[in-house]
């Protein structure tokens, strides 16, 4: 289920974000940023997420990519260091020129990179539940907020 959701999200993200922002002379690839900790305390949780996104990218590319363009993953390691998420997010958007970012496993990592996304008009797919009461046009919150979880409990 998680893999299928990631696959659908990647495809939607490329269609929405990447193609309209690409320069006319762009290569036949769309760069996808992966912002998950591969070292430090959060690596045990986030390495699996990185692997899931890479697997989804491989599946999309095997089917011809997105609108004929292959997806090119750009993986960075913020090393479970919350301020480093902002720095690595900036690197992905400005130096690596990714069209979209998948990443962050904690609210503090998301909140660290959020000002960078807002400043540079980047797009983040955030893969986990969050506390709610935060809205950004630069973040797809794919996890449930508390009010959504409460509705399920009440209807059960």
Identify what each model region corresponds to.
Residues 3-11:
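N-terminal export leaders
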Residues 66-79, 135-139:
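Short beta-strand elements in bilobed, periplasmic/extracellular small-molecule ligand-binding domains
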Residues 33-52, 76-83, 105-108:
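Extracytoplasmic "Venus flytrap"
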Residues 97-156:
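Extracytoplasmic ligand/sensor domains, especially the bilobed periplasmic-binding protein
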Residues 22-26:
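Sec/Tat signal peptide C-region and signal peptidase I cleavage site
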Residues 27, 51-73:
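Signal peptide-proximal N-terminal region
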